[in-house]
Amino acid sequence: MREPVVPGQGQCWGGRNYKFDSAEQQQWMELMGAKGWTAPDWPTEYGGGGLDKLQHKILKEEMARINARSPLDSFGIWMIGPALLEFGSEALKQQHLPPIVRGEIRWCQGYSEPGSGSDLAGLQAKGEDRGDHFIANGQKVWTSYADKADWMFCLLRTDPEAKKQMGISLVLFDMRTPGVTPKPILLISGNSPFCETFLDDVRVEKDQVVGEVNKGWTIAKYLLTHEREMIGSMGMTSPASETLGQIAARTFGIEQGRMNNPMLRAEVAKWEIDGACFALTAERVTDEIKSGSGVGATSAMLKYYGTELNKRRFETLLKIAGSDGVVWDGEDSKGGWLPRTWLRTKGNSIEGGTSEIQLNVIAKNILGLG
């Protein structure tokens, strides 16, 4: 679990139906999950590692020192888990958090709709009150890996008479529930990480509501903060990820071809400097958010700069690759991972709130403009 991770490959997502790349990948996830180190700073009573801030930092540094891969990539750990810790009932925490830590359940997010993307509060998917449960009807879109997920955390309008940002509830349901139909969306990259998800008379138990009924908007915004941090972190180099210079050396050779170009070398160096600065900033901001001392809009800053940094990374990689960077098929192209991932990064600055929206948030809440 110390081999370099090719972008878009090599991650471990877990879940009921997940097919591991190797026995070593499965063992790594299971061992780390058993210690709670897939979620090191979560409380031990919910399966986490129970580490304090300093211990968590030391663990990350040691993982980086041995060049270890992340044992588990999970919307459960990144998004719904923190929301449950903050707003969930004790029963929901006990039910959902330990399986997330162990990688047994894979989650997806039911937020965006065909007419409600950036204007999330305008969502139309409804949850009709039937006493001890809701009946959900509507459509979600851009639902990442809904066809592979086990559970969904989903926003429903449970009070159609309330004001736009009121009457919304955050609910949880099993993707095997009758009436849930995910349909993959084929992207220009040739991959299908997103789905349309149709809800037709889906029964959602009221004990699966996070927080209070009709008061899910506050939780939704909290979740969006974590989503933007997650998407923004795409611009960072993880412990087992290669830097641009390392990829260039391994794939093309530093002392030959395009890497002899001093302007291209300077571009690679500039990206690595910016990437290191971003990683340090992200660590500082994350610590501030966890301690409650950070500015609420800093997640917008991380999301904006991180996604732009990630797009720059693959633009530079294409320059390094030259004509090899446009090969989609063939033994040496590894399934065309470079052009496919380059195309995929174009969506980074749209998903989770466009770059334009993030800049408006930064201008208003950090710079005090307008």
Regions from the language model: what does each represent?
Residues Q9-R16, G253, R258-R265, A276-E331:
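C-terminal helix-coil-helix/basic helical segment that borders enzyme active sites and/or dimer interfaces
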Residues L54, I58, M79, N214, ...:
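Glycine-rich phosphate/cofactor-binding loops in nucleotide/flavin-utilizing enzymes
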Residues M1-F75, A91-R102, M230-G232, Q246-I247, ...:
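Amphipathic, small/basic residue-rich leader segments at the start of a protein or domain
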Residues L72-A91, G117:
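N-terminal glycine-rich flavin-associated loop
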Residues D132-H133, N137-K183:
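A short core secondary-structure module
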Residues A125-E128:
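A structural signal for short hydrophobic beta-strand segments in well-ordered beta-sheet cores
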Residues G103-Y111, L155:
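A short, Trp-centered hydrophobic/proline-enriched beta-strand micro-motif
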Residues V180-L280, N348, K364:
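Glycine-rich beta->alpha junctions and the first turn(s) of the following alpha-helix
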